[in-house]
Amino acid sequence: MKAAKYLKIQGRFAMQRGHLINPTIAFETWGTLNASADNAVLIFTGLSPSAHAASSPMDPSAGWWEDMIGHGKPLDTNCYFIICINSLGSCFGSTGPASDNPETQEPYRLDFPVLTVEDIATSASHVLDHLGIDQLHTVVGASMGGMTALAFALEQPARCNRLVSISSAARALPHAIALRSLQREIIRKDPIWQNGQYDTDGHGPITGMRLARKLGMISYRSGEEWAERFGRERAPDFTESDTPFGIDFEVESYLESHANRFTGSFDANCYLYLSRAMDLFDGLDHGGSLTASFSSLQLESAMVIGVGTDILFPIVQQQALADALAEKVSDVAFVALDSLQGHD
């Protein structure tokens, strides 16, 4: 992450269920902040991305949202100053379970406080203070990032003019919580996990992470997309083996290669904490109902985007979020995308 910047929050950083001392938040920026500092767009990521959302002169490698950020693109750097933070609790520069605890000089591991989406949103406010930004033009997020964007708008209403929520919701449904619970159990059942005490410089619970990632990827796409993309095609390197349980099909090969790539780049404990944070978030906690929770919002407009084939955050959740926002916000757009891509 050659273009990453790092903000150390000095002193005690209060969290909903604990605190950190001098945590670091990694972030990247694109474009130029104007003289009135009112053209800033803040991006919150999903569970797994880093802050490297797009290429830049400092880091020309493609980012995970390359098609969205840049000259003439939807997040136009000719007009906006774009900020993307790496979530607190992650492993791409921001303080998380894999980071050293300054009080012990050892990784936090499971001594890291319980993490909430609100904690991630609060950490972003320190980045804005550091950059001299009092009020955002827009806050944007997809999946977990959409939850974080909503939490930011609820916790920092005066700093947020516009909200864009993509494939997200005000709370996770039981089936999504159940799926993530199974992913976490798969990781924790890996003998190498060792109650979170694995060597962070070594291999870690690779088998558990690989299987959890495969399960996640299945939920990120729709059955229709799998069928259209892979059908029952055999894997390109398919050969008859002595066991009937090898990788015979192209879809199996796809899952295997992507899971292996993810496992080599993401820390297991960080995954556990961020996954749980998604489960814990509930917009109703800010008022008892969405109507009451949203009463504090000061948004000029909001856009809620959903995908009809999304399994994790069904389109009915996007509609419900848009309807609840419309009770408080005068300009709310709901966009239902007709796509086979599902959550991804």
Model regions and ranges:
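N-terminal cap/lid subdomain of alpha/beta-hydrolase-fold enzymes
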Residues: 28, 36-101
